[in-house]
Amino acid sequence: MNEADGRFAGDRGCGDIHEPMVSEPAGRTVRGLLFGSVAECYERYRLDYPNELVDIVLRYAGRPVRTALEVGAGTGKATRLFASRGIEVTALEPDADMAHVLDRATRGLPVRPVVSTFEEFRIESRFDLVYAAAAWHWTSPVTRWARAVELLVPGGVLVLFGRPAELKDPDLFAAVEEIEKRVLLGDDPVEVHPWSIEEMAAADGLADVEQRDLPYVATTTAEEFVGRLATVSAYLKLSPDQRAGALRQVRAILPDQVDIDATVQLSLARRVDQSVS
């Protein structure tokens, strides 16, 4: 890490980290739109998803999946997996900087990046699959389930997944958690909307809800782990000096290599087929 500016030397390859400037008219920072300030680092440090994830989704679907809508595509970590199977993906990403990296990372694949939120996306057709990779908590809890159903063909599949990417060692996990309790700001309920499998199961128009885990432990360097933390919204809400100080504190307590719990957690549901036979 460069002590002068709080950045890792390796971050030079991520491009400039600029201050988030996304605000609503009232001035409240839109936390879900902070990631563009670190788009290149997001692509570099966020973990990729395993191919097995797509296998699980396709088996669950039980029928051809030709089209998909991705909610909050980011830089295309999950987009590339599905598109590489020949699925035509409409990838929604509300942040223009993230969408720029997404477009570059998916060239040559059947991907149509769209700069839009899930709520504002204009419905032109229905999809065989709607999915979100670590992004569903940015959607509106009032409309998201009904909108997902509206966007799916009868019998189509909704898949929500993510991975914790947390330190496997309980002592290190607790030590980092203690630092974060001191320096990070709490979640704003106006910005972050957690969801549960119970909500998914209770949503009108969805059935056959299942949960699957893909256990995986990744070994990474401390610098890569801290680089990933620098792309987390809770850190991006801090001022540059606060963020650099927090990351220095975390790096100081880590060994050179760490094991990460990178288990992929999936929730799957099917739109009820209301067609008349």
Predicted regions and their residues:
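Conserved catalytic/acceptor-binding region of the Class I
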Residues: 147-216
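A short acidic, Gly/Pro-enriched loop at the edge of an enzyme's catalytic core
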Residues: 122-130
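Class I SAM-dependent methyltransferase SAM/SAH-binding core
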Residues: 69, 75-120
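Conserved class I S-adenosyl-L-methionine
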Residues: 10-63
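Conserved Class I S-adenosyl-L-methionine
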Residues: 197-277
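A short, conserved alpha-helix within the catalytic core of class I
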Residues: 139-148
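A short beta-strand submotif of the Rossmann-like class I SAM-dependent methyltransferase core
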Residues: 132-133, 141
